[in-house]
Regions:
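Cysteine-nucleophile active-site neighborhood
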Residues: 50-124
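Hydrophobic, well-ordered secondary-structure elements that form the walls
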Residues: 43, 80, 97, 138, ...
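Generic recognition of flexible, low-complexity loop/linker segments
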Residues: 30-33, 66-67, 87, 125, ...
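Short, glycine-/Ser/Thr-/acidic-enriched flexible segments
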Residues: 5-7, 32-33, 48-51, 84-85, ...
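Structural motif
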Residues: 24-26, 41-42, 75-76, 97-98, ...
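Phosphate-binding active sites in nucleotide-utilizing proteins
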Residues: 1-2, 6-60, 65-70
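Amide-donor transfer/coupling interface in amidating biosynthetic enzymes
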Residues: 105-197
Length: 197
C-alpha cells in the first residue's frame, strides 16, 4: 500500500476489510523508497496529492520503472485517482510510471465531481460484466485518456466512461469503498494469491 504525503487518501474501513480477509498490508513510499517491499503480491495506489510532489516522484526513476514492470507483468494493482495519475505518462509534464496512456493536467476546477454508479463493461479484477458499484470522483486534474472499462452515471443522468480494468488492474479517477461491494476485496486478494474466485 502506497502511504506517504503524495498517497494518503484511503478508506480505513476498506483497508481493515482487506486485513480481515487475510491480507498483510505492507506500506511503502513512492516518494522515498527505491524499490517495492520484498515479497509483495499486489499493489494498492490510493488517492492523494501526487501533483504536489510530481518532481520528487519523477526523480524516483528506480521505483517508477519497477512499478511499471510489475504492472505490465500482471501483478494485481488498484490505483484510485492520485494512484491512477501516478500510473499515467506524466503529471504536469513530469514523467510518471508510464504504465497507462495519458498526460494529466490541472483543469483549475472540480472535474466530474460527485457520486456515480459505475457499471463494469467487461469482467475485470474487481467486477464482472454488468455489475454496478457506487463510487465517487473528487479531483481537479484530468487526462484526455481516462479509460473506458466502466460506464459512469451521476444521479442527474449524466454519463461517461472511465477507468482502465483488466483481470489484474483497476485504475481510474473514481474512488470506491470495499464495503459497497465486499466481493471486490475478495477478488483482489484472490488475484494476489493467484486463486480463482
Amino acid at each position: 500500500v502506497a502511504r506517504d504525503r503524495a498517497f494518503c487518501f484511503y478508506y480505513e474501513d476498506s483497508l481493515d476489510l482487506l486485513r480481515q480477509l487475510g491480507a498483510e498490508l505492507v506500506p511503502f513510499s513512492p516518494l522515498a523508497d527505491e524499490k517495492l517491499p520484498d515479497g509483495v503480491q499486489g499493489l494498492y495506489l490510493g488517492g492523494g496529492y501526487p501533483e504536489l510532489y510530481a518532481a520528487r516522484l519523477e526523480e524516483n526513476h528506480t521505483l517508477r520503472r519497477q512499478i511499471r514492470d510489475v504492472v505490465y507483468a500482471g501483478m494485481p494493482c488498484i490505483a484510485e485517482c492520485g494512484g491512477f495519475m501516478y500510473l499515467t505518462q506524466s503529471i504536469a509534464g513530469r514523467a510518471m510510471v508510464g504504465a497507462l496512456p495519458g498526460d494529466c493536467f490541472d483543469t483549475g476546477k472540480l472535474t466530474r465531481f460527485g457520486y456515480i454508479t459505475a457499471t463494469a463493461r467487461e469482467d475485470n479484477l474487481l467486477c464482472r460484466a454488468g455489475e454496478q458499484v457506487p463510487m465517487h470522483e473528487f479531483h481537479h486534474w484530468d487526462t484526455p485518456q481516462p479509460g473506458d472499462a466502466f460506464g459512469a452515471e451521476k444521479p442527474s443522468g449524466k454519463q461517461w466512461r472511465c477507468a482502465y480494468a483488466t483481470d489484474t488492474l483497476y485504475a481510474g479517477f473514481p474512488h470506491f469503498h470495499f464495503y459497497a461491494k465486499p466481493v471486490m476485496a475478495q477478488r483482489f486478494l484472490a488475484a494476489c494469491r493467484k486463486e480463482t474466485l
